[in-house]
Amino acid sequence: MVTYRFVEADTPALRRLPFERMESEGIARAVIWNRVDPCLLDWLECVNPQYAFCWLAHDRNNALAGTVWLNPVMGLCGCVHFCIFKAARPDWKNLGRQAIAHLFQARPLAGLLAVWPAHYRYVTRAAKHWGFGKPALLPKACHMPGIHKPARCRDGLMAVLQRKNFNLEA
């Protein structure tokens, strides 16, 4: 089992790295789904240190395997976001679990909220595997503009993972 090392993206150069990888893998639009053609500035807005914490996950060879970012929501709850890069996707269960453990160890969080487009079935599967509760439907919650439909909104799902229900030791 791979053990990932998490580094806080606390400089502009570190915060830029995930977007460069997203672009090279052709997944920037899937990750930054509220923009028709996401650019670096859109990504930097997502991980702006004024309202987000961002960590980079590196594998044993120090290659960037993924990124996780957290927006504090209310009190001790944060909205969590993941991006797992191609080389690490076969290990998504392990990487996601380690990312969640890292978040709970790095911040005094009572729970994590995840919100995603309902048609992203792989995210629904991942949320279930990582221990998030049953997803609830949020009608038209995800602004996903298209070139010809700039106001398009799609249904979203949301789920919660409470610290007390997550085994940090596993």
Language-model segment annotations:
Residues 27-31:
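Residue-level signal for secondary-structure boundary elements
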Residues 32-51:
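Active-site rim helix/loop that mediates acceptor-substrate recognition in acyltransferases
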